[in-house]
Amino acid sequence: MLEYILWTALYVLLIVIPLILVVAYYTYAERKVIGYMQDRIGPNRVGSFGLLQPIFDALKLFLKEIIVPTNSNRYLFFIAPILAFAPAYAAWAVIPFSKGVVLSDMNLGLLYILAMTSFSVYGIVIAGWASNSKYSLFGALRAGAQVVSYELAMGFAIVGVVIAAGSMGITGIIESQAGGLWHWYFIPLFPLFVVYFIAGIAETNRAPFDVVEGESEIIAGHHIEYTGSRFALFFLAEYANMILISILTSIMFLGGWCSPFEATPLEAVFNFVPGVVWLFAKTGIFMFMFLWVRATFPRYRYDQIMRLGWKIFIPLTFVWVVVVACMVRFGVGPWW
């Protein structure tokens, strides 16, 4: 029993520590990419080309004093960042990086991930309420409404993938797309593919859906009163969720670790490329799109965000799920 616990703890560390490093350098890439798009240089002072900037940013955050606001609920104030951080990293337990390379290959992997990503909003709402600040509270209320609105659209998109694949296990979904580019679900499920990724941007409170922490309205929203390591936990959770949405989009709609050249004359040429490389390459595309969208689009008004979620995304995904179910039931389309 003890040996099992130790091995499990080791596997968890092998996922969490590299993920934190990826998050750190994702912030560096974000500043460089957005700087280039805005005709700036970006960080270039700490280390060669600014490569040590994320390390020193982390040191700065974790060495800062933790300030607790007057009349705040101290217990909830301290527990909220953990409630935001823990589910964001726990969701990675069921992500397969290649065939057999997964911490826990659950039959209900997608349901588990949907549950974990939904839990993060509790940390945001509790942080807003416990901080004893009107700006924090407004940000928390916005976060709650926004997550509920876009979680439904994401849920319907996931249901469409599950119906098409005939499995809720993530490995099963990837294997159902084997056979090359034309077997990937982004073609027959294109509306669900687009809605899922846009809803993922909204779910992570990123621009142009970042009204939860709109600087011009409520300054920093739910984490305005947080400093030091507590703020860093919210920061780590946000970027881990962005990477999670990117890798899930790759898995559900772009075949995961499957090569795009399967069942083609080029299959033998690219056969040496490991599946994990294909997965990371596809994930990198969506990680870049998060940055591109942030640098390009202005922030929506809150009523526009709600209208987009309830009047466009939810009806669209619901109708497409019905269409996919009928196609699968009557043997029409690319699944037969």
Curated annotation (Swiss-Prot):
InterPro entries according to UniProt: NADH_UbQ_OxRdtase_su1/FPO (IPR001694), NADH_UbQ_OxRdtase_su1_CS (IPR018086)
Enzyme class, broadest EC rank: translocase
Main location: membrane
Any one GO MF annotation of this record: NADH dehydrogenase activity
Keywords recorded for this protein, A-Z: Cell inner membrane, Cell membrane, Membrane, NAD, Quinone, Translocase, Transmembrane, Transmembrane helix, Ubiquinone
Membrane-traversing stretches: 4-24, 75-95, 108-128, 154-174, 181-201, 233-253, 272-292, 308-328
GO annotation, cellular component aspect: plasma membrane
Membrane topology: Multi-pass membrane protein
Function: NDH-1 shuttles electrons from NADH, via FMN and iron-sulfur (Fe-S) centers, to quinones in the respiratory chain. The immediate electron acceptor for the enzyme in this species is believed to be ubiquinone. Couples the redox reaction to proton translocation (for every two electrons transferred, four hydrogen ions are translocated across the cytoplasmic membrane), and thus conserves the redox energy in a proton gradient. This subunit may bind ubiquinone.
Family affiliation: Belongs to the complex I subunit 1 family.
HAMAP family in UniProt: NDH1_NuoH (MF_01350)
The protein's assembly and partners: NDH-1 is composed of 14 different subunits. Subunits NuoA, H, J, K, L, M, N constitute the membrane sector of the complex.
Protein name as it appears in the record: NADH-quinone oxidoreductase subunit H
Organism of origin: Francisella philomiragia subsp. philomiragia (strain ATCC 25017 / CCUG 19701 / FSC 153 / O#319-036)
Taxonomic placement: Bacteria, Pseudomonadati, Pseudomonadota, Gammaproteobacteria, Thiotrichales
